[in-house]
Amino acid sequence: MAAAAPAAAGEDGRRRLPGAALDIQPQEGAKVEAESGELERLRAELAGALAEMETMKAVAEVSESTKAEAVAAVQRQCQEEVASLQAILKDSISSYEAQITSLKQERQQQQQDCEEKERELGRLKQLLSRAHPLDSLEKQMEKAHEDSEKLREIVLPMEQEIEELKAKLLRAEELIQEIQRRPRHPPSLHGSTELLLSRDPSPPLEPLEELSEDGGPAAEAFAHNCDDSASISSFSLGGGASGRASLPRSRQGLSPEQEETASLVSTGTLVPEGIYLPPPGYQLVPDNQWEQLQLEGRQLQKDLESISRERDELQEGLRRSNEDCAKQMQVLLAQVQNSEQLLRTLQGTVSQAQERVQLQMAELANSHKCLSHEVKRLTEENQGLRAEQPSSSVPRVLEQDEGWEESLPSSLPELQQLVRRTQQEARARQQAQEHEAERLRIEIVTLREALDEETAARASLEGQLRVQREETEVLEASLCSLRMEMERVQEEQSKAKRQEVLRPSQGTGRTEEAQLTDLLSEQRAKMLRLQAELETSEQVQRDFVRLSQALQVRLERIRQAGSLEQVRGIIDEAPLRDVRDIKDT
């Protein structure tokens, strides 16, 4: 009995457990259906996102190609700017070197001019040094003039004294004649003569004493040079009896004219002894020659002053030119340093730009790789989800029910743990799906931005196409004008030919024909060149149109693709980077 009771209890427990499992099973089925519906919705959204992502991928490839072209254009522009700056620097350096050489040549020329002026100045100094004897001669003439003035001051009082002596001599002769007329009284004659001679014995010496007192060194020099002691003593009448006895004898047989001549001769013998004689090597010149020499000396002095001023001006000009040259050299060196600094800055900027471009290219390549991997992963997940998806929900529910019935635990705590674990897994899957959906939304926004950029690039290409069309229209108009000009030239040529037939002279016609032929050849060459330019522009326009049409067709095919394989096939086609790709495809 005891054994039967536990067996019955076990059977009752087993009966209750399927009942509880049957109660839990409808709830889990509803949850699974809701999750499966959400999963289907997410899968549909994922498929749409994948299709849009594939479209964006194609657009990204096109934008990448355009970006590469833009980067290449920027690099070419930077290289052209660097080359132009280097050419400008070379031109500026060559011009600066030419200026420096010209300044050096000017400086050498100024130095040569200064040397020539210095040589001319030395020559003039030599001439002036040769003219120095004129200055000494002038000084000597002035000294002689002063000596003559002093001599004149000495001679004039002596002439007055001589006149007084002559007067006294005349009176003495008159007295002698009176005495001779009276020979009876010899004693009285002697007494009268003594009386006459003793009447004023000192006056002849008074002027000499006064002269010696007043004249000073000049009188002593005159007395020393003239040595007139004997002459003056000859006029002295108070020297004793011998003088008194010889006077009548010396004057007895002379007439007044002879006495005057003798006195003048004696005076002439006195004066030349006091005249100043120049030292040896010098000569006395007349006044007109002296004035001429003075004029020449003043003229030479003026020339010397003008040359000195010119030398000072040249030295000042040379100093200023040296300062200007130094300043210009400093300015040129500063400009060269600034140019070198600018070149280094530009080189650094270009290198930085190249580094940034390389980094951007690397980032774009990495992002492209990441995007490719992500697309592949999403494609694999999508394929896996599609492969795991059952044909209908009923067999899936039955299979799940059978699996759950088989995997249901036998105890209640285990069943509760299973429910909690299932709920956690469902929440984890939901969070993962939310994260995946958010990531897909971000990727969709990014791809839309790239699509907008591509649209802007397309708009810019259309603008360039319009500009090219306008240029083509201008070229067509110029071609039409050239054709009209060609027709006009042909008409003129035909007229010229007709006139040439009418003209008698052939030389003029040949010349005009040659000129018209040259003009025609020039116009033909010009027309051919314009036709070639027009054809080139038309070809470029056609290429732009074909490229834009091909891109539009490919984008439209990507948008209209129904499956991921079609999008991958469109993407795997050859990239449209050039018109040759369109021709090849």
Curated annotation (Swiss-Prot):
It is found in: Cytoplasm; Early endosome; Cytoplasm, Cytoskeleton, Microtubule organizing center, Centrosome; Cytoplasm, Cytoskeleton, Cilium basal body. InterPro entries: Rabaptin, Rabaptin_coiled-coil, Rabaptin_Rab5-bd_dom. One of its GO terms (cellular component) is intracellular membrane-bounded organelle. GO terms for biological process: cell projection organization; endocytosis; protein transport; regulation of cilium assembly. Transmembrane segments: none annotated. Residues 178-265, 381-408, 491-515 are annotated as: Disordered. The keyword Acetylation applies. The modification Phosphoserine is found at S188, S192, S198, S202. It comes from the Eukaryota. Pfam families: Rab5-bind, Rabaptin. Residues 27-183, 288-540 form a coiled coil. Keywords: Acetylation, Cell projection, Cilium biogenesis/degradation, Coiled coil, Cytoplasm, Cytoskeleton, Endocytosis, Endosome, Phosphoprotein, Protein transport, Transport. GO terms for molecular function: growth factor activity; GTPase activator activity. Belongs to the rabaptin family. Plays a role in membrane trafficking and in homotypic early endosome fusion. Participates in arteriogenesis by regulating vascular endothelial growth factor receptor 2/VEGFR2 cell surface expression and endosomal trafficking. By interacting with SDCCAG8, localizes to centrosomes and plays a critical role in ciliogenesis. This is Rab GTPase-binding effector protein 2. It comes from Bos taurus. The lineage of its organism: Eukaryota, Metazoa, Chordata, Craniata, Vertebrata.
